[in-house]
Amino acid sequence: HGFPTFAVSIAVEHKGRLEHAVIYDPMRQEFFTASRGDGAQLEGRKIRVSSQRTLEGSLIGTGLPFRMDPGLVDSYLAMLKVIMGTAAGVRRPGSAALDLAYVAAGRLDGFWEFGLQPWDTAAGVLLIQEAGGRVGTPTGADYSLGQNIVAGNPKVYEELLAALGPLTPAALRA
């Protein structure tokens, strides 16, 4: 379709821990990197998650799950309705990897999506963690690759969990 939102996303996992991450946006020529314990960078400059204190003033990224079970669509739309009614704005650019990099860089205050694959999230998870953010599941459990994801700066992350958790059906709780 020629829609220019895509990225190269690479992560190195060693003994079950994400150690290094790279997300490259060839359209904007931006290079995001992180190494465990060394922080996150954009073009070699340290980045941090936003300092936004509430969901009400935040910009949230999401995606529309790929081939979602039709029985779960209403649940997802209910979540979208709550976030759209609370946040300053919701964006759906199309690349989960870039959305997560944008959370790490403070361009987005939070993110959630269901049905992503490990290659969609691995690099972004480490970027956010190294930039001072939080990543988990919709129920607040620790995130493991391949699970449904909620991420953000620490304050917005907690508010996203409070908003999304009660609306998350059992089939999407992993």
Report residues per predicted region.
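Small-residue (primarily alanine) positions within well-ordered alpha-helices
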Residues: 21, 40, 124, 131-133
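Hydrophobic residues within well-ordered alpha-helices
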Residues: 101-104, 125-130
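Alpha-to-beta junction loops
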Residues: 105-110, 133-134
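Acidic donor-binding loop at a coil-to-helix junction in glycosyltransferase catalytic cores
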Residues: 119
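Acidic, metal-binding active-site segment of PIN/NYN-like and related structure-specific nucleases
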Residues: 132-148, 153
